[in-house]
Amino acid sequence: MRRCLNYFILILFIYSISYSQTESELLKQLKSFREIAEIKEIKTDTTYQEGYEILINQPVDHKNPKSKTFTQKIYLSHSDYSKPMVFVTEGYAANRSSKTELARILEANQIIVEHRYFGKSVPENLDWNYLTVEQAANDHHEIVELFKKLYIGKWVNTGVSKGGQTTLYHRYFYPHDVDVSVPYVAPINLAQEDPRIYMFLNSVGTEECREKIKNFQRAFLSKRDEVRNLLMKDAEQGQIRFAWDYDFVLEYMTLEYSFAFWQWGQTKCEDIPEPDASAEVLYNHMKASNPLYFFTEQAMKDFAPFYVQAYNEIGYYGYDLSPFKDLLTEIEDGSNIMLVPESARIEYNCSSMQKVNKWLQKEASNILYIYGGNDTWNATSVQLLGENNSLKMVKKGGAHGTSIRSFDGEEKELIYTTLGKWLGMKVNRL
């Protein structure tokens, strides 16, 4: 009898533990929100107590009360309701819930938001008219409003590259949603294809390095027949479906090379092959700097929403063909507008970024900008006028992967001190 009783108590104990784990106080609160369509528990960083992948109902058109809806994916990593919240605005799909640098610095909770029209956050009927920075900012505002019911500490929004741009657009439309913004390597393009990119590529680094880049590009084009064969071999062996014919792809790779070289900073000037190197050496170097994926049908599909945004509102870049005109047979102008899907209508709104830029320069506050000095996107970085307390930090020689940890000494200390002052709290120094 006693054995049966002990067994029964053990079963109750196990059941109570299991129930408490699946029905934490946070989970109960999340389930009570009518805006949440789906919740799935996930593994998250060990410094967090709980982690969830959540689908949130959002209107396709926030300006229309009768709008159709879609579900937007977010990742929530929970530590403590009273701690700060780092609100990560992705520019594309969100495929991970890893803890960001900023969340470690602030010992913060974290929400990562997938951008509308990317990943799992795509409306059923793809209407490009509702892919705007304002509609995306409305998405973010709705999520902030919802989770501020739970998290009472300071809020900081942040993002990297296009995600950093998205951080700034969110702050522009809803300046009081967060206390501080930390956009990483976020360009503010002021034209459909911003000409400042050309000026940057003609002045970054040393003249010797820029000349070596150009000579490599010309050599790559000059060995067209051999390079084409190598490209075809890779396509066949890797079952790669390119978005264009082989000659167009190799020309496109050539034009993109200088932008990618400085953007990623993974190749040193001394590593660039000499013009008399074999076609195979030239080709392998090009692939390492310009992964073939970016020229495939799959990449065009994955990045289609970005190209729609770029050419309708947030801007992009083109190429200077003049150094290669005598070697090009497929590409007749330097525009990238051919990347936009045929289903999208292009009508560039030149005033959109002008308004954002003016606000960032004159009215914004508590924004910490992180840039890499050699990153091509630094060409169109925000230009502060000293009319607010925003801080722009540029890592000398830094590339598109520049972070707070990339800085040293007094520069890094200034970043930590500024964050601590704006948030009124002590911050971790990584």
Which residues does each PLM region occupy?
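Bacterial Sec-dependent N-terminal signal peptides
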Residues: 1-25, 201-212
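Alpha/beta-hydrolase
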Residues: 10, 169-306
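Alpha/beta-hydrolase active-site loop
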Residues: 130-149
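Gly/Ala-rich beta-loop-alpha elbow adjacent to hydrolase catalytic centers
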Residues: 159-163, 167, 171, 375
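C-terminal subdomain of alpha/beta-hydrolase-fold enzymes, centered on the catalytic histidine
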Residues: 263-430
